């Protein structure tokens, strides 16, 4: 049985997420299988049959509003709200968009390290506040258009949304890259997700 499914949005960072998750599982003594599928390799019915316990939607190029960029991921967000689901970068933007938020062009950042301020919620347990995180993105989730079902859980000093969670479901998003070497606390964030 696949316990953790990573959906790859054709991004090189997906391998880093896979490697980080695998290291954490080994360190925690968890014998869980991780499967990686590209966003156009499976239909939602195939994923239902896999019945993963946790899902990570990877970073990637493009816009979550375009199926050509986001593949099956929007369907996954709609279908699997009953289990822990984490979106990273494009995955985060897709979650925000799926629940009615506006995702727009922002200032492009590539490898920029910033301080992130968080609310101490479950993903940020044992994470310093603030902490340093690496950003690679050109789209941003607009704070003024945050859906009622979504809670902002982390921001930069200039109020750019860095993390969200659904108010009812175990659905989370991270704009920053926890798998980056420039995000020292990223391992703790991913560990907190995998422990859910």
From Swiss-Prot:
Its EC number is 4.1.3.27. It comes from the Archaea. SUPFAM superfamilies: Class I glutamine amidotransferase-like. The lineage of its organism: Archaea, Methanobacteriati, Methanobacteriota, Methanomada group, Methanobacteria. This is Anthranilate synthase component 2. Residues 3-196 form the Glutamine amidotransferase type-1 domain. The keyword Amino-acid biosynthesis applies. Heterotetramer consisting of two non-identical subunits: a beta subunit (TrpG) and a large alpha subunit (TrpE). L-glutamine binds at residues 60-62, 93, 138-139. It catalyses: chorismate + L-glutamine = anthranilate + pyruvate + L-glutamate + H(+). Keywords: Amino-acid biosynthesis, Aromatic amino acid biosynthesis, Glutamine amidotransferase, Lyase, Tryptophan biosynthesis. One of its GO terms (biological process) is L-tryptophan biosynthetic process. The active site is at residues 89, 177, 179. GO terms for cellular component: cytosol. Pathway: Amino-acid biosynthesis; L-tryptophan biosynthesis; L-tryptophan from chorismate: step 1/5. Part of a heterotetrameric complex that catalyzes the two-step biosynthesis of anthranilate, an intermediate in the biosynthesis of L-tryptophan. In the first step, the glutamine-binding beta subunit (TrpG) of anthranilate synthase (AS) provides the glutamine amidotransferase activity which generates ammonia as a substrate that, along with chorismate, is used in the second step, catalyzed by the large alpha subunit of AS (TrpE) to produce anthranilate. In the absence of TrpG, TrpE can synthesize anthranilate directly from chorismate and high concentrations of ammonia. InterPro entries: Anth_synth/Amidotransfase, Class_I_gatase-like, GATASE, TrpG/PapA_dom. GO terms for molecular function: anthranilate synthase activity.
């Amino acid at each position: 049985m696949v316990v953790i499914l990573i959906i790859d949005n054709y991004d090189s960072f997906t391998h880093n997420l896979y490697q980080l998750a695998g290291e954490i599982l080994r360190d925690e003594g968890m014998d869980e299988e991780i499967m990686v599928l590209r966003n156009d390799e499976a239909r939602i019915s195939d994923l239902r049959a896999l019945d993963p316990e946790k899902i990570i939607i990877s970073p990637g190029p493009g816009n979550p509003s375009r199926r050509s960029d986001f593949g099956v991921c929007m369907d996954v967000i709609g279908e699997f709200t009953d289990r822990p689901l984490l979106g990273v970068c494009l995955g985060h933007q897709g979650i925000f968009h799926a629940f009615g938020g506006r995702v727009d062009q922002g200032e492009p950042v590539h490898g920029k390290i910033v301080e992130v301020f968080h609310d101490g919620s479950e993903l940020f347990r044992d994470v310093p506040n603030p902490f340093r995180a690496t950003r690679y993105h050109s789209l941003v989730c607009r704070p003024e258009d945050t859906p009622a079902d979504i809670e902002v859980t982390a921001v930069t000093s200039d109020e750019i949304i860095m993390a969200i969670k659904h108010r009812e479901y175990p659905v989370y998003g991270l704009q920053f890259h926890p798998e980056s070497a420039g995000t020292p606390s990223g391992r703790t964030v991913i560990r907190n997700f995998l422990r859910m």
